């Protein structure tokens, strides 16, 4: 917001300044957090930001100064790896559940996705992945 020509007074929209996908996501998240919700549902909230920005956002979400249950729907493993509980759904059915480490040890869909997103061949993954 500070980088926009008029800061908080900048008009956004069809006749206003265009925002990138990542900027839209960050502003939407900031608006959601401004009301200090008890429950926050985030659907691919960081899909359009770079990895460094995602790390920063995740760190800030962990340090919220109020109680907030966070439900994170994501494609990126990096978005959910620090969650207390991760659920993998297929056709509306939970097929895997656990922490990041537990799901890696199961060597199921989560593990395969982790390997794919991190450039690791599942069959030759080093033991430290587990």
Regions found by a protein language model. Give the residues of each.
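Helix N-cap at the start of a conserved alpha-helix in ABC-type nucleotide-binding domains
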Residues: 51-52
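Catalytic Walker B motif of ABC-type/P-loop ATPase nucleotide-binding domains
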Residues: 40-43
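A short, proline-enriched helix->beta-strand linker immediately N-terminal to the Walker B motif
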Residues: 34-38, 67
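Conserved catalytic loops of ABC-family nucleotide-binding domains
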Residues: 63-74, 80
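C-terminal portion of ABC ATPase nucleotide-binding domains
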Residues: 1-7, 59, 67, 81-130
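Short loop immediately C-terminal to the Walker-B catalytic DE motif
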Residues: 46-47
